[in-house]
């Protein structure tokens, strides 16, 4: 019962609003208008998306320059095991893991373990 009353109140309120509330017919003053170039870009993007879906391709519409650059893994030179003592090897692996895990790139533990061992 309460939901029906709420719906009726909302319908009556929106019907009772004067048409001068809107700046232009069909356009709300609270929603910013799209500029013509933005509207054209939006239409173009939607056209590309629909074309890709029709072709069965993934819907990645971003331009190549807007895509996130691929992160390259830093090359970690592993010294020969004969060169280092057991304690030195363990320290180097631990240091490699520390720098890998706390670095800017944000590798997972498994990725760091693969690179450092």
From Swiss-Prot:
It is found in: Secreted. Residues 53-77 are annotated as: Disordered. Expressed by the venom duct. The keyword Disulfide bond applies. Disulfide bonds join 96-116, 100-112. The keyword Signal applies. Keywords: Cleavage on pair of basic residues, Disulfide bond, Ion channel impairing toxin, Neurotoxin, Potassium channel impairing toxin, Secreted, Signal, Toxin. One of its GO terms (cellular component) is extracellular region. One of its GO terms (molecular function) is potassium channel regulator activity. Residues 23-90 form a propeptide. Residues 62-77 have a biased composition (Basic and acidic residues). Residues 1-22 form the signal peptide. It comes from the Eukaryota. Belongs to the conotoxin R superfamily. The cysteine framework is XIV (C-C-C-C). This is Conotoxin vil14.2. It comes from Conus villepinii. The lineage of its organism: Eukaryota, Metazoa, Spiralia, Lophotrochozoa, Mollusca.
